[in-house]
Structure formats: C-alpha cells, structure tokens
C-alpha cells in the first residue's frame, strides 16, 4: 500500500515485475486526478488502484473493504509492504494512524518510510540551534502553509512503539538541520 502518494511521485521506484498490486490511499481530491494520470502514464493501470481515502482507520478501512481486501472474517493483515513518504508528518493523529497501518501488515511485512522529524538536539548529531529554528518555523506558520506538516514529531519512535518488530533499518539524514529526515523500514514480527 502506498500511503499518501500525492501525485504518484514514488511510482517510478516500484518494480512492476515484482508487484502484484498497489493500493494508493490519497485523501486530496486535487492530488487524486494527478495520481490517476501518473498511474496511466507510468503504465501502472491494472496494477495500481487509487483509493480516495486517508490513512486514518476510519477512512481507510471502509475503502479497503470496498476493494474487497478486508473480508467478513475481519482479518486485517493484508499487505506485504506499506510505504509512507513524507505523509505521517501531516496526519491528525499520528500514533493512532501508524498503529492502524501496522495492523494492516502481514507477519514479516515491511513498513517503509521517509519522514520529516523533530530535530533530535539531545543527540550527538542534533543541534540546539536548528531545534530552535525548527520551533520558530512552526510557530510562524509552517503547518498552515505546508498542508499540515508538523516538523516536531518523533515519527520513528511512533513506528517503533506501534508494533512488534523482528528487524529494522533506520537512517537519519541532515540531523543537524531544522528539517531533518529519517528513512528506513521495520519488519513486522511473525
């Protein structure tokens, strides 16, 4: 599942030969029309289904049922891989949303992500100055101009706490900056 694919910028990184089907959960109507175009232009028709919904369970679960992915037996462990790229910074309830997404992973499934995070100024690679700048940017309207993006989330920690993991790979990038990132994956226990 591709969570918050926007216009489909990540589709070029998916391997059409190994993917059976991708379900893209995109809540923005403005992005959906562009996503449909990208899917067509990249040759993903028949292998990429756009779901007009958000990542939150109350929106996502009905969309997955409509696709026939969640059956009457209630089993929600349906995805081999869930990809989140710069989207978890914008969901209203990140901890609950991530927990809901993790429940959709099959045992051994991967939760892959690339996300903005809070500057970890208390670590050796963090920066108190950058953390102060980050805080000021947030105070002076970052969220309202950047589609709800919250730069002050500890997203990797939220993912860590959302499930039982048997393996993980994390890389922190530009830790010293006011807009640091973390990317990597967690493999669900099982």
Question: How should these model regions be labeled?
Answer:
Residues 15-19, 92, 106:
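Short conserved AdoMet
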Residues 95-107:
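A short glycine-rich, Lys/Arg-flanked "PGG" loop and its adjoining helix->strand segment in the class I
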Residues 182-190:
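C-terminal lobe and adjacent flexible extensions of AdoMet/dcAdoMet transferase-like proteins
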Residues 1-66:
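Class I SAM-dependent methyltransferase SAM/SAH-binding core
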Residues 77-93:
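A short SAM/SAH-binding and catalytic strip from SAM-dependent methyltransferases
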Residues 114-183:
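C-terminal alpha-helical "lid/dimerization" subdomain adjacent to the S-adenosyl-L-methionine
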Residues 60-82:
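A short acidic, Gly/Pro-enriched loop at the edge of an enzyme's catalytic core
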């Amino acid at each position: 599942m591709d969570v918050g694919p926007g216009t489909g910028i990540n589709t070029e990184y998916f391997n059409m030969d190994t993917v059976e089907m991708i379900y893209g959960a995109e809540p923005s109507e403005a992005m959906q029309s562009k996503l449909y175009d990208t899917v067509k232009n990249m040759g993903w028709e028949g292998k990429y289904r756009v779901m007009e919904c958000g990542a939150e369970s109350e929106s996502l679960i009905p969309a997955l049922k409509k696709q026939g992915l969640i059956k009457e037996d209630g089993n929600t462990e349906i995805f081999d891989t869930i990809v989140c790229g710069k989207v978890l910074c914008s969901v209203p309830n990140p901890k609950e949303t991530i927990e809901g997404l993790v429940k959709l992973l099959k045992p051994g499934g991967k939760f892959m992500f690339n996300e903005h995070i809070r500057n970890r100024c208390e670590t050796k690679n963090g920066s108190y100055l950058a953390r102060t700048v980050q805080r000021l940017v947030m105070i002076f309207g970052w969220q309202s101009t950047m589609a709800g993006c919250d730069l002050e989330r500890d997203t990797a920690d939220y993912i860590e706490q959302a499930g039982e993991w048997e393996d993980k790979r994390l890389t922190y990038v530009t830790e010293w900056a006011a807009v640091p990132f973390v990317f990597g994956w967690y493999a669900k226990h099982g």
